[in-house]
């Protein structure tokens, strides 16, 4: 969000994050946004304070965000807790659990699972009529037959993080 005005001012090209996209979409009256995964709390955030601006923006911008969870490279346990702390609704569409982006599900339960699109739509209409601030995350997992095994992904991420530390690779 903070770099959006800088890009406009300098008339340069830029890409958008979830936070800047929902900020722009909301200002244009768009109510729905679909993305692969949201940002979240990074591993070792207790030392680095590296938490995606997506979470803060989700807490204050009214948007219905459909996604397959938070990106797998993140600390999904801390991300789940931070979503709850910020009061962001974690809704499942035909799933009882928050998906893990590339894999079908984590062990984190959603606030509610809607099986029928009609029931989900009714919930969203009620929420909109009450003018409750903040976004609703609607988790729609990758199909089971297209998902990657959770243990494989976690192993790859762990190896990559260790390699980055060993090579002193850091970044924004």
Locations of regions flagged by a protein language model:
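Glycine-rich beta-alpha junction loops
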Residues: 39, 69, 94-99, 140-146
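General beta-strand structural signal in soluble alpha/beta enzymes
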Residues: 14, 32-37, 43, 65-67, ...
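Active-site glycine-rich loop that binds ribose-phosphate moieties when present
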Residues: 17-18, 46-59, 63-84, 117-122
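Anionic-ligand binding region
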Residues: 101-129
């Amino acid at each position: 969000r903070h770099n959006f005005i800088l890009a406009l001012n300098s008339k340069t090209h830029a890409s958008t994050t979830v936070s800047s996209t929902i900020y722009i979409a909301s200002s244009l009256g768009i109510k729905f946004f679909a993305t692969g995964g949201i940002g979240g709390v990074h591993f070792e955030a207790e030392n680095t304070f590296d938490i995606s601006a997506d979470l803060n923006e989700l807490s204050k911008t009214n948007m219905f965000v459909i996604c397959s969870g938070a990106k797998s490279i993140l600390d999904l346990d801390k991300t789940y807790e931070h979503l709850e702390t910020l009061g962001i609704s974690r809704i499942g569409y035909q799933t009882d659990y928050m998906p893990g982006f590339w894999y079908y599900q984590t062990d984190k339960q959603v606030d509610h699972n809607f099986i029928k699109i009609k029931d989900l739509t009714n919930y969203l209409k009620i929420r909109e009529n009450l003018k409750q601030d903040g976004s609703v995350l609607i988790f729609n997992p990758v199909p089971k037959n297209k998902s990657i095994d959770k243990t494989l992904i976690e192993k790859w991420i762990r190896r990559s993080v260790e390699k980055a530390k060993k090579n002193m690779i850091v970044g924004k």
